Amino acid sequence: LVCLVGSEMCIRDRSIYLKLASESNTYLFESMQGGEKWGRYSLIGLSTNNLLKLTGDHLQIIADGHVQTDLKSSDPLGEIQKFKDSFRVPDLPSMPRFTGGLVGYFGYDSVRYVEKKLATSTPPDQMNIPDVMLLVSEELIIFDNLAGTITLVVHADPSAPDAFNNFNRRLDLLEIKLASTSANPFDMTSGHQKVSEDSFVSSFGEERYKEAVRKIKEYTIAGDIMQVVPSQRLSAPFFEEPINLYRSLRRLNPSPYMYYINLEDFFIVGSSPEVLARLENDVVTVRPIAGTRRRGVDEAEDKALERDLMEDPKELAEHLMLIDLGRNDVGRISKSGSVEVTEKMIVERYSHVMHITSNVTGNVQENLTSIDIIKAVLPAGTLSGAPKIRAMEIIDEVEPVKRNIYGLSLIHI
């Protein structure tokens, strides 16, 4: 690992994001804490030709742009863990939690690698993208918005021939790229395309969606399920640069987890308040979020809406159910007696809404891996239901298309 720290002058040039986003297999992660102030760190992952793709039972490991390994496995997630175990990223106390490693997504349907009974009930796939896609992130730019610094991070194998000189060459190239005054590769005028509600096409259609809801209600009344979270895909043509969509989302809906990922054939743009799971210092954390009200126009209305939220029996019951679901997920991977609800029903405010949140932690069992943590918590209960497996069976029954990256989990390990 080699780091180079520069001054805040680099940070002020926001076009850094845009210069790098023109390349595939890059990403940008930003954060706004509580929806009200920017988080300390922003991360840019530079382009890589090393990645993993998993579709069905077919895993590809790509090195330097070429398929190095192409295999079918009954345990493809285990194969991903083996790949991760082949390298190590040092912990740096002066840096964010993540400074390189595997970055990408586990789609909603990656749960089928864990719950085998769901493997044969997958709805039709209209997107034809990998269920799991992970970039090997070896070159990063880390913005420290508090210290006013920018850090260039390069990872390489120290046992490789001429390793130190190679480090220096790569760092020099990054400095040149940052200092470049080349024209912006994007058309930033934005706004030429007008998208209305009529532009969107539903994967369901209104009547079929209503029928799906009726069927779910029948299952619920019969006691077969407590909650199911149905979804529908809404699609519309989009001709703007994808980075413009991210810029608009960043402005209109700033959240704790904002992400823009430029992959080979598609982009992922999103903004979320929810962490699925975090493993740090052998403590695993999940953070259930359920129960919502809009923000008030002033402090008095804001407080009135909070009181209404915290007195709503439906919202409280749903949140308690998700706490129980979180305790169950954490309990599967934690040492006996270590599971705790460290925060219970705290109202957090974001730019447009407020949510009820809780915090569930546990001391992770010895010899478990990061992939074991992911397997235990997929997918989020807020996007599936409870009991989770039965809810997903019903989702497969009523939804017309595979969810793909809807309900995905963005991963950095």
Language-model features, listed with the residues they occupy:
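Extended alpha-helical targeting/anchoring segments
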Residues: 7-8, 12-411
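Extracellular interaction modules
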Residues: 1-6
